[in-house]
């Protein structure tokens, strides 16, 4: 058995983008046991993944995590975060390891000065660079997203007008530059001839109410427990941030 630790602390979109590599690790390495270290608030994204055997949650004490991880005696560590915390963990474990080309400076040039020298390589394929030494290759089966049975939200519980299909629109985002203004969202919604469910968190309630008032709508949800199921069942899923 080969025991492998994958480090990815955040965030939702980036975590989902790690799933092809994790699946291929599990399926292409015989008797592989896959562990993940991630932030506590994102742990459920990995806990529902059948290709992962164990999830370690980082909250406040990286020292505690390191002490626990040392006991696992990993055969290999895959750093998909590549920041100060993940490097600290990798060095402390002292096991064979690899990372991926993060290209931070190139991303800075693109986002700040609009100078695009980014390679034409998808981030998923860049993640696979970290496991080349293990002879793991992309199977091109796409991303994985697994929903816990306890979060299943039957469409029958929605109003009748939603049961023949609906669109879902995520109105929040990690950064202000990734959040569409309510007026712009309302403009989009007015062009849609299907019922729409607005999705977000507690910080998005006020924004949702403004959007509803602009389009004369009646319903919204900010319940994170059912967001994933609503996204999955929607005919069209729109967002401005990565999800």
Predicted regions and their residues:
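Catalytic machinery of carbohydrate-active enzymes
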Residues: 1-243
